[in-house]
A protein has these predicted regions:
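Accessory DNA-engaging acidic/polar modules
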Residues: 1-65
Length: 65
């Protein structure tokens, strides 16, 4: 997606969203509402790698595909 990438980290069993720049307050709130938490270790917003996580990522980022 423009401004970042979605990573399926199978080693950590996490779906991670990595932004090129810090997301604004509204975007961070959307991530939190969709179950994502900030991971300083990976520098990514992440949640457990599931089918629902992929759906939530698209919803949080406003992606339709």
């Amino acid at each position: 997606f423009p401004g970042g990438e979605i990573v399926r980290n199978t080693e950590a069993d996490r779906l991670q969203i990595i932004f090129d720049e810090k997301p604004d307050d509204e975007q961070r709130e959307a991530l939190k509402q969709n179950g994502f938490r900030w991971s300083p270790r990976y520098g990514a917003w992440q949640r457990q790698l599931t089918r629902n996580a992929e759906i939530a990522a698209r919803r949080a980022l406003g992606l339709t595909e």
